[in-house]
């Protein structure tokens, strides 16, 4: 099940790459276009399909990450404890949380081509700056799953700040574990926990 969720969240990452490219284009249209582009790249590039980590990371870095607001995601995941952190600690938390998400879901992005994605109509009032883009994802032998993206319109375009899989928020899932870590070991302990997890991923653990 965890593998499926990781694959779906990799799909969610893939669906956001071009959200800031054209302000007049609705976020759902941009999401659809970019999802198709990422799937096409994965299908055509044998190295990526084969799990070439260097190429996978390059794809994620160039097509996806610029359109996520990792600082806001980290702040939401850390929750009320964010205010306890110094500016330097906030920067460290954002850096390590970003690395955690990248490493976790880059490993699953090669599976995005296996899924069928249906994009739901977007109801966005004029002047709206916070939207929810909804999709339904399915795969042979698996019940359909809803993936929603929460996006905020910022000065430099639409930015994703949360992803929901079957109404389960990514930042909320992490908030529960982060709060537990802060209660036991403080902000510094949370940072060290993230550092260890990222080092373990780097070393193949």
Question: At which residue positions do the language-model features occur?
Answer:
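Bacterial N-terminal signal peptides that target proteins for export
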Residues: 1-8
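N-terminal signal peptide c-region/cleavage motif recognized by signal peptidases
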Residues: 15-19
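Early exported N-terminus immediately downstream of N-terminal targeting peptides
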Residues: 24-105
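Extracytoplasmic
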Residues: 33-36, 59, 65-68, 88, ...
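Solvent-exposed loop/turn segments at secondary-structure junctions
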Residues: 82, 99-100, 124, 139, ...
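Surface-exposed, charged secondary-structure patches
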Residues: 103-145, 197-205
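Short beta-strand edge/turn micro-motifs at domain boundaries
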Residues: 146-172
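Low-complexity, intrinsically disordered terminal/linker segments enriched in charged
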Residues: 162-205
């Amino acid at each position: 099940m965890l593998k499926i969720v990781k694959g779906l969240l990799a799909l969610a990452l893939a669906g956001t790459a071009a959200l800031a490219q054209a302000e007049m284009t609705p976020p759902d249209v941009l999401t659809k276009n970019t999802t198709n582009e990422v799937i096409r790249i994965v299908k055509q590039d044998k190295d990526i399909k084969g799990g070439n980590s260097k190429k996978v990371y390059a794809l994620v870095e160039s097509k996806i990450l610029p359109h996520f607001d990792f600082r806001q995601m980290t702040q939401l995941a850390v929750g009320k404890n964010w205010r306890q952190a110094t500016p330097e600690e906030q920067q460290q938390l954002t850096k390590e949380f970003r690395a955690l998400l990248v490493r976790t879901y880059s490993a699953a992005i090669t599976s995005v081509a296996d899924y069928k994605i249906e994009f739901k109509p977007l109801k966005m009032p004029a002047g709206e700056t916070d939207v929810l883009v909804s999709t339904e994802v399915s795969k042979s032998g698996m019940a359909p799953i809803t993936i929603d993206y929460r996006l905020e319109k910022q000065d430099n375009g639409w930015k994703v700040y949360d992803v929901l899989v079957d109404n389960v928020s990514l930042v909320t899932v992490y908030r529960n574990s982060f709060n537990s870590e802060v209660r036991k070991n403080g902000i510094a302990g949370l940072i060290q926990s993230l550092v260890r997890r990222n080092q373990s991923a780097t070393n193949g653990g």
